[in-house]
Design a protein with these regions (language model features):
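Beta-sheet-rich non-transmembrane sensory/scaffold domains
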Residues: 1-232, 236
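Short, intrinsically disordered C-terminal tails of secreted or membrane-associated proteins
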Residues: 256-261
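Generic hydrophobic alpha-helical membrane-segment signal
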Residues: 130, 248-249
Length: 262
């Protein structure tokens, strides 16, 4: 192929590439901060290559989705009866660059890659986001038609909404934080936010899987960070139990937690 193949169906479930129009614009002042933050980086569409980082020049290519992907390794959920695939995803970026190594370090490579997980990054003041929201979302993809059935932010994103520069703004749901894969019941799509240490997580969230409408009766606070939802069980009284596999961290109480709903 003369070019990198670009899929045409289904549409992307997450942002691809970064342009100046993708920078956050909650207020003119915050927009100016974002423009300043990326002045030493190359912006471009999906598949923009890494670049040589030199002193006094550009410091790398901003890539989106980031190297961990738009979707997470915990995967999606599929309904074989309706043909809908439910994909949670994250709106994040990485900086890709390479540099000329110091000959004194040994080796015979002309260039060395860096910036995959760390290195120079565009930094916003006071922990503000660099890009426009949502920062996490869930997309229902109709596999029969190759189209989106619905797409919704996953959570309100209070970590940003409660920021001193943002708390007085009338912002839409921004999306929380979460790497967990969803599970399905006959009517519900259950997912979770693993935003430990933030104002709106961790939380268990349920939606009507056909319409994306949030089921407030199923939302609840979780005590631990976790990766995926790993099991669902129905008992004789039709009580739904969801077992959470926690990721324990220092200073957290031990033991699993269970969510249930009649």
């Amino acid at each position: 192929s003369p070019t990198q193949p670009f899929p045409t169906k289904p549409p992307p479930f997450e942002y691809q590439g970064v342009s100046i129009d993708d920078l956050v614009d909650f207020t003119p002042e915050i927009r100016a901060m974002a423009v300043e933050a990326v002045k030493d980086f190359r912006l471009g569409p999906l598949f923009s290559p890494p670049m040589l980082s030199v002193d006094g020049g550009l410091q790398g290519t901003i890539q989106r989705p980031y190297v961990g992907g738009g979707a997470s390794w915990t995967g999606a959920a599929v309904d074989p009866e309706t043909g809908l695939l439910y994909v949670p995803s994250m709106n994040r970026f990485s900086v890709l660059k390479y540099y000329t190594p110091d000959p004194a370090d040994g080796g015979n490579l002309r260039y060395t890659m860096r910036g995959l997980a760390a290195g120079t990054q565009p930094r916003m003041p006071q922990g503000l986001p660099l890009l426009k929201p949502p920062y996490t979302r869930i997309t229902a993809i109709d596999l029969n038609e190759g189209e989106h059935a619905w797409m919704q932010p996953n959570g309100d994103g209070n970590r940003y909404r409660n920021h001193p520069l943002l708390r007085d703004l009338d912002l839409p749901p921004l999306g929380g934080e979460g790497h967990g894969g969803p599970v399905l019941t006959k009517t519900l799509l259950i997912s979770a936010l693993s935003a430990g240490g933030t104002d709106d997580g961790p939380r268990l969230v349920a939606r009507d899987k056909a319409t994306s409408v949030h089921d407030a009766g199923w939302s609840g606070i979780l005590y631990y960070l976790f990766t995926p939802l790993v099991l669902r069980i129905y008992d004789s009284e039709l009580v739904l139990f969801v077992l959470i596999r926690p990721n324990f961290q220092r200073n957290q109480r031990s033991g699993p937690r269970f969510a249930q709903q009649k």
